[in-house]
Amino acid sequence: MSFSDVLQLAKIGKRDLASILLKEEFGKMQSPEQRVNLCKWIASCFEGLEDYGSAAEWYEMTGLLSLGETSSDSANAIRALPEYEKARAYYTLCDEEEKVELCSSVIAQLNKCFVAS
């Protein structure tokens, strides 16, 4: 099944099935960069579908994966920060207070990484 087929499933309301299929594809990928790019793509797809809760989860996952992408902590922080900021914004829209606080905490830590470097 192609990614466009999976997106079509999401558009017709079969988001649970689409999510399962995307996670299976995600598990097959070896490269951290591929995983980060897939997460960003999935997040933007959910954003386009106005499913902001799912978009937030995928942006948060993108940020998490970005933290381990290279051996440079500061480079990883630079990549992860905008993803956590997007996740926090969408969690805010969805009134997910606990997740907003978690993202805010991670963002504060990432900002400290910039100051330290």
Residue ranges and their predicted role:
Residues 35, 55, 60, 72-73, ...:
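Residues that mark the junctions of alpha-helical repeat units in TPR/alpha-solenoid scaffolds
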Residues 15-16, 32, 52, 77, ...:
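TPR-repeat structural position
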Residues 1-4, 33-38, 49, 61-62, ...:
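Generic helix N-cap/helix-start motif at coil->alpha-helix transitions
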Residues 4, 41, 61, 66, ...:
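"A position-specific structural signal for the A-helix of alpha-solenoid helical repeats
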Residues 1-30, 112-117:
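N-terminal alpha-helical interaction modules that lie
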